[in-house]
Curated annotation (Swiss-Prot):
Subunit structure: Homodimer.
Pathway, per record: Cofactor biosynthesis; pyridoxine 5'-phosphate biosynthesis; pyridoxine 5'-phosphate from D-erythrose 4-phosphate: step 4/5
Enzyme Commission designation: 1.1.1.262
CC annotations in GO: cytoplasm
Group of enzyme by EC: oxidoreductase
Organism of origin: Hydrogenobaculum sp. (strain Y04AAS1)
Binding site for a divalent metal cation: 158, 202, 250
Protein name: 4-hydroxythreonine-4-phosphate dehydrogenase
Leftover remarks: The active site is located at the dimer interface.
GO molecular function, one term: NAD binding
Function: Catalyzes the NAD(P)-dependent oxidation of 4-(phosphooxy)-L-threonine (HTP) into 2-amino-3-oxo-4-(phosphooxy)butyric acid which spontaneously decarboxylates to form 3-amino-2-oxopropyl phosphate (AHAP).
InterPro entries hit by this protein: PdxA_fam
Keyword Oxidoreductase listed: yes
Amino acid sequence: MKIFGITMGDPAGIGPELILKLQKDMEDENAYVIYGEEYILKHASSVLGQNFYYEKVNSVDDVKDKGIYLISLSLKGALEPSPSSGKLAIAYLARATADAISKKLNGILTMPINKYFAKASGFSFNGQTEYLAFADNKKDFAMMMYSDAIKVVLATIHIPLKDIANAINVELIKQKIKLIKDYIPKYFRFIPTIKVLGLNPHAGEGGLIGDEEAKIIIPAIRDEDVVGPIPPDTAFIDIKKDDIFLCMYHDQGLIPFKMLAFDKGSNVTIGLSFLRTSPDHGTAYDIAYKGLARVDSAGYSLELLKRYGY
């Protein structure tokens, strides 16, 4: 039996609804521990008209059999978008992360948080990915968007576009390549073909449209078994099953990914000591508790945990 953790995310968003909709996916030989509050689950269950069956426990140590469990932190907070809802989301993330690091869990699925309200609550990180790496004491990590159709890894994550050229360097790119080579065979059990994108239009056009390719990317990949630098506008024309694209910035990778796999992909943090997955969308405050949330990405994220978590 494996034990997986699922954080509720921002309770003002669609995280609680997604958890309810995953109930049938959790009716197997594994144990699933939800980090959240009972009153939130009951509210979601009432609004959506769906029964949700679980057992309350104080810690993962109390989980002895398959089923769905709830660890309540006994926190009160708003069910409307606010620093209060952001604070709850971070509390659930912190508790689940601690249990994953201590090997009490075989992996975690984190429901979406809102970066603005998380920051407003005192959270000092740009996102869950950065927090997870800090808590796990990992300096080398990366955000990977994973699907059957396309897989991308980001060299930089949540930084402004104007700062990207100064953020990339030879060491950074080598580090991301090593992460991919080490992590993918370990967790996902295949040897990837790594395709490195250029930063500039046409990958710099021989230095006519920027020199980051010549000064940074080419030196970084010269002795590596990778393909690149590839012009970003043609990189995704021909995608093979084992391809992993190393993209220089967030939207360079996320735009093609969400076009091809928005409802069938997952956000995976590579470099951690455990497997973490997350839906590839946000809190969707505008449709929360209306029964409108699509569970596809959350379901795929859970499936990855079950398939590859250990």
